[in-house]
């Protein structure tokens, strides 16, 4: 989906989320606490949310929310992001993508 690729590549950190998902809330809070200002797309609030969710599933994202892209690259869902954070790889990745300066 061309629109999805554009959404992913426009910002250094992009999160696809749903307001009703507790793991989405956890991931958004983590990035905000780290000082990152991610672009967040709430799939249950935007008109093409189901279409975007289907496109994420075709990329192999399961579950389809939350899904995080850093520097235009798929990082994955909550498990992958938390693993990167716990092994101290997330912050360097964010710095390389220009999402963090400190």
Swiss-Prot record:
It is found in: Cytoplasm; Nucleus. Residues 1-101 form the Glutaredoxin domain. PANTHER family: GLUTAREDOXIN (PTHR10168). GO terms for molecular function: 2 iron, 2 sulfur cluster binding; metal ion binding. One of its GO terms (cellular component) is cytoplasm. [2Fe-2S] cluster binds at residue 21. A motif (Responsive for interaction with TGA factors) lies at residues 99-102. It comes from Arabidopsis thaliana (Mouse-ear cress). May only reduce GSH-thiol disulfides, but not protein disulfides. Its main location: cytoplasm. One of its GO terms (biological process) is response to nitrate. It comes from the Eukaryota. This is Monothiol glutaredoxin-S3. SUPFAM superfamilies: Thioredoxin-like. Gene3D superfamilies: Glutaredoxin (3.40.30.10).
């Amino acid at each position: 989906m061309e629109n999805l690729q554009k959404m992913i590549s426009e910002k250094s950190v992009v999160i696809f989320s749903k307001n009703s998902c507790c793991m989405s809330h956890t991931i958004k809070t983590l990035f905000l606490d780290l000082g990152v200002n991610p672009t967040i797309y709430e799939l249950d609030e935007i008109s093409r949310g189901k279409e975007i969710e289907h496109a994420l599933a075709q990329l192999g994202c399961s579950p389809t929310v939350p899904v995080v892209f850093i520097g235009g690259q798929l990082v994955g869902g909550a498990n992958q992001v938390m693993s990167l954070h716990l092994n101290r790889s997330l912050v360097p990745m964010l710095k390389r993508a220009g999402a963090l300066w400190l």
